[in-house]
């Protein structure tokens, strides 16, 4: 019984910490994880179909991907 109560308390604490992060900051963290580099418009081919600026990631070759409109 103590283990269940402890698990519920820990879950509530984790949820409250997640809610404390603003949505915009969370989006910035997510974009950073995708490997988006908006300053030079390069993107990580493994990051998915979008770049930080909303452009699409186009794989030009095996080693080169760019954010294109």
UniProtKB/Swiss-Prot annotation:
Propeptide, chain numbering: 21-34
Kindly list the cysteine pairs connected by disulfide bridges.
36-52, 43-57, 51-67
Would the keyword Signal turn up in this protein's UniProt record?
A: yes
Keywords from the UniProt entry: Amidation, Disulfide bond, Knottin, Neurotoxin, Secreted, Signal, Toxin
| Entry keyword Iron | no
Which top-rank group of organisms is this from? Answer: Eukaryota
Q: Cellular component terms, GO, for this chain's entry?
A: extracellular region
Tissue specificity annotation: Expressed by the venom gland.
Q: Where is the protein situated, by its record's location annotation?
A: Secreted
Question: Which terms does the record give in the GO molecular function aspect?
Answer: toxin activity
Domain characteristics, as noted in the entry: The presence of a 'disulfide through disulfide knot' structurally defines this protein as a knottin.
Indicate what this protein is called per its UniProt record: U2-agatoxin-Ao1c
Origin species: Agelena orientalis (Funnel-web spider)
